[in-house]
């Protein structure tokens, strides 16, 4: 009886591992590596340009990206780029007014990536933690980086393209974006 229970537990554990590995390989796509990416003239042009932010319309910081999104319902928007490492490499393209906003997040783990939309707000309501978020489906995406791995403090150069369906039914729309980005890994 104990051997039979042990076999069942072992089968459940192995089945779970196979399922998790399969889901990782299906959902997380491979990152393309282009070692010459950092030599592109667009990155040198970023150093000459200033990026306006919510707090400074003149722009005091050097431009970090030219990523922009177009969708069925709005004209293009320019995004800010933030790069963090904890334990996955997280690249966030964000637009907002300081109180609420959103954008797209690219999580990279061992040369595989996953794209997802995200949003934030300072108007938190009771039971917001139960909200699973808006429906989305990544129709197409591509991420190109200049190196295989990064540590905190490293410079990162990259390019991304994405096509995401957000919502469904009459509220469905397609958002498409692409652009180069650079920065330091925080």
Which sequence ranges carry the predicted segments?
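Ser/Thr/Pro/Gly-rich low-complexity linker/stalk segments immediately outside membranes or between
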Residues: 24-42
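Surface-exposed helix/loop patches within compact recognition domains
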Residues: 53-152
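Short, Lys/Arg-rich N-terminal segment immediately upstream of the first membrane anchor
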Residues: 1-6
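Targeting-peptide/extracellular-domain and disordered-appendage signature
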Residues: 23-26, 58-60
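Hydrophobic membrane-insertion alpha-helices, especially the h-region
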Residues: 7-24
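C-terminal or internal capping secondary-structure element at the end of a domain, subdomain, or sheet
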Residues: 146-186
